[in-house]
């Protein structure tokens, strides 16, 4: 018989764990003594719900980062397999490599043929090592664009799922052209004729995210993050102290709410109370409903109109000031 997995608690969730332990203790005593304490249990459960709502309504950027990295947060493959009517993974960059940090393939969403792809983190330590913790190599980005071009050739919309700390920054990655591979993807994704919807499901880290992140719509889960660099790296660069990562997380404006205010994302996807890992089925339904709605809107536009709007969307990003000569 399968045993229930022990929950993985984050630091800010410990008060909730203490309250849950108290509820279980009352239940156990009630069973032992044969006493009806349903009113007391109901009150404690209400307190637990209120406390959970209070905690998750006031999360700091650093706490949202912890949720985005939660080991049990649904992955790209989890979402693809859950929202697809059919799914067939495709492999290889046609240059001799097949990076497992990027998964890609053809699928059906609500009966419509689409291409789905994204970074894939491991489900355990061994799998994480095999998938390089979701950090793609140049081969991964070349595989991604090959399959996106396949989608464009056959008129299939493209759905990308972003979940990576960053692109792989090893010496071999540089030797094989990491910067060129990402830059090529950026250019080519602007040229594609089909609708493109990108969704940040966990971590959206730096150029690693951008390599599959050019689209007509950019969606983001409520507790996902999107940044120019991991907060730890930013803190190490600016203050020579990785312990200042929480301060960097505040300064980087990594949360969905911040990015929506800045006009960088199009929609925040609400998560079940406690995060997507608490109720993956609920999170999947939210994602699927949104993707279908956006696909319907984008399919009503002509290809030239979509491409122009995609281009202008990215041209509007960023703020700069210019002083008088």
Curated annotation (Swiss-Prot):
One annotated GO biological process = malonyl-CoA biosynthetic process
Q: Which gene encodes it?
A: accA
Which SUPFAM superfamilies did the record assign? ClpP/crotonase
> What is its pathway?
Lipid metabolism; malonyl-CoA biosynthesis; malonyl-CoA from acetyl-CoA: step 1/1
Q: Protein name, please?
A: Acetyl-coenzyme A carboxylase carboxyl transferase subunit alpha
> How is this protein organized at the quaternary level?
Acetyl-CoA carboxylase is a heterohexamer composed of biotin carboxyl carrier protein (AccB), biotin carboxylase (AccC) and two subunits each of ACCase subunit alpha (AccA) and ACCase subunit beta (AccD).
Enzyme class, top EC level, equals transferase
HAMAP family to which the protein is assigned, alphabetical: AcetylCoA_CT_alpha
Q: Which family does it belong to?
A: Belongs to the AccA family.
Among its keywords, does the record have ATP-binding? yes
Reaction it catalyzes: N(6)-carboxybiotinyl-L-lysyl-[protein] + acetyl-CoA = N(6)-biotinyl-L-lysyl-[protein] + malonyl-CoA
Q: Which UniProt keywords apply?
A: ATP-binding, Cytoplasm, Fatty acid biosynthesis, Fatty acid metabolism, Lipid biosynthesis, Lipid metabolism, Nucleotide-binding, Transferase
Q: What is one cellular component GO term in this UniProt entry?
A: acetyl-CoA carboxylase complex
Q: What does the UniProt function comment say about this protein?
A: Component of the acetyl coenzyme A carboxylase (ACC) complex. First, biotin carboxylase catalyzes the carboxylation of biotin on its carrier protein (BCCP) and then the CO(2) group is transferred by the carboxyltransferase to acetyl-CoA to form malonyl-CoA.
Ranges where the CoA carboxyltransferase C-terminal domain occurs = 43-297
Where does the record place it?
Answer: Cytoplasm
Keyword check for Transmembrane helix: no
